[in-house]
From Swiss-Prot:
It catalyses: ATP-dependent cleavage of peptide bonds with broad specificity. GO terms for molecular function: metal ion binding; threonine-type endopeptidase activity. Disulfide bonds: none annotated. The lineage of its organism: Bacteria, Pseudomonadati, Thermodesulfobacteriota, Desulfovibrionia, Desulfovibrionales. GO terms for biological process: proteolysis involved in protein catabolic process. It comes from Lawsonia intracellularis (strain PHE/MN1-00). Its EC number is 3.4.25.2. It is found in: Cytoplasm. This is ATP-dependent protease subunit HslV.
């Protein structure tokens, strides 16, 4: 059976960035295996925040490789993301990994996809996982029509997403820079 289901959301707003992830792990289409998974973590001297969607073992492999590139590049998020993407595209083992990363620092937001793409959103809002599209839509609406902080927008967007997406819950991990 396929293990799936999560939402990871990044919101960059008013000079701050928030990265939120829910805690649900779902087996197949109908069984919730865990409610309190931690899919968001700080990296490289607390200057980078990363979240994952996809198979847990694959995500940890990517976290480890990404962390190594952050160390090699002295925390340069752009270079680390590009180097990981290059390796991801070239390595036969990595190409089979079923995971995505959403990474942020004080200046950049990137989605690192399983095909080796590095995507930086135009508006600083990005999401991955089963509820990603709902979370992005909610965050964009809140940015345009409220005075909330990045963290408040991320939290409220994840609440809205959890009401719509059965693979997302409200046990959030929220980190900010």
């Amino acid at each position: 059976m396929e293990i799936r289901g999560t939402t990871i959301l990044a919101v960059r707003h008013k000079g701050h960035v928030a990265l939120a992830g829910d805690g649900q792990v779902t087996l197949g289409q109908s069984v919730v295996m865990k409610h309190t998974a931690k899919k968001v973590r700080r990296m490289y001297k607390n200057q980078v925040i990363a979240g994952f969607a996809g198979t847990t073992a694959d995500a940890f492999t990517l976290f480890e490789r990404f962390d190594n590139y952050l160390e090699e590049t002295n925390g340069n998020l752009v270079r680390a993301a590009v180097e990981l993407a290059k390796e991801w595209r070239k390595d036969k083992y990595l190409r089979r990994l079923e995971a995505m990363l959403l990474v942020v620092d004080k200046d950049h937001t990137f989605v690192l996809s399983g095909t080796g793409d590095v995507i930086e959103p135009d508006d600083g809002i990005a999401a991955i996982g089963s509820g990603g599209l709902y979370a992005v839509a909610a965050a964009r609406a809140l940015v345009a029509h409220s005075e909330l902080s990045a963290a408040e927008i991320a939290r409220e967007s994840m609440r809205i997403t959890a009401e719509i997406c059965v693979f997302t819950n409200l046990n959030l991990t929220l980190e900010t820079l």
